[in-house]
A protein has these predicted regions:
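A short, solvent-exposed, low-complexity linear motif enriched for acidic/polar residues
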Residues: 1-160
Length: 160
C-alpha cells in the first residue's frame, strides 16, 4: 500500500511553507509506461489497467454486506485514451486526464503530519446499491461524474 507522502525538504524550508500542494495522478509519459519497468509504487500491477489507459490514480473497491455482498468499484484514471490497441500507449494526451490537484494549508509546523480521508465525502450523493461501478468508463457517465465532482469540490482530504 502506498500510505505515506515523504517530503524531501529541510526543517527550515518546512517552517516557511504555507501550503502542501500535490497532484493525484501521473504525468502522461509516466502514466502509460509498463509498470514492470517502473520503480515502486508504480510497479504495482493491480493499479495498472493497460498501456492505453495507464495507471489507476485512486482505487476504491467496496462491498455492501446488506445487499448480498454487492461489489462496487471506483477506479480513477485517465479515460478515452486513443491508441492502436490496449497494449499500445497513446501518442497524445487522453481526452480525460482525471488528475486531481490538492492544496492543503500548512497550519502545523511538524515533520510528522497525518492526513485524514473521508470516504463518505467521496461517495456523497452516489447510490451504491443502484449505480454501476465506475472503472475507467467515461467520466461523463453517472456515477463517475458525481464522484469526480466530489473529488474536485468536496472536503474529503484534510490534516488529521
Amino acid at each position: 500500500a502506498n500510505n505515506k507522502i515523504i517530503l524531501d525538504v529541510s526543517e527550515g524550508l518546512l517552517k516557511l511553507a504555507t501550503n502542501l500542494r500535490f497532484t493525484m495522478g501521473l504525468p502522461f509519459d509516466v502514466n502509460h509506461t509498463d509498470p514492470l519497468a517502473q520503480a515502486s509504487p508504480l510497479n504495482d500491477t493491480s493499479m495498472f489497467l493497460n498501456k492505453q489507459s495507464g495507471h489507476r490514480f485512486l482505487r476504491l473497491d467496496l462491498s455492501h454486506a446488506g445487499a448480498n455482498n454487492k461489489q462496487w468499484q471506483y477506479h480513477l484514471g485517465s479515460a478515452n485514451c486513443e491508441s492502436e490497441s490496449a497494449d499500445a500507449a497513446p501518442e497524445a494526451s487522453c481526452a480525460f486526464t482525471n488528475r486531481v490537484e490538492f492544496i492543503l494549508p500548512m497550519t502545523q509546523l511538524d515533520s510528522e503530519l497525518a492526513l485524514e480521508i473521508s470516504v463518505s465525502n467521496i461517495l456523497a450523493q452516489v447510490d451504491l446499491l443502484e449505480a454501476d461501478s465506475c472503472e475507467f468508463g467515461s467520466p461523463e457517465a453517472q456515477p463517475c461524474k458525481q464522484l469526480l465532482r466530489n473529488l474536485l469540490n468536496r472536503p474529503w482530504i484534510k490534516w488529521d
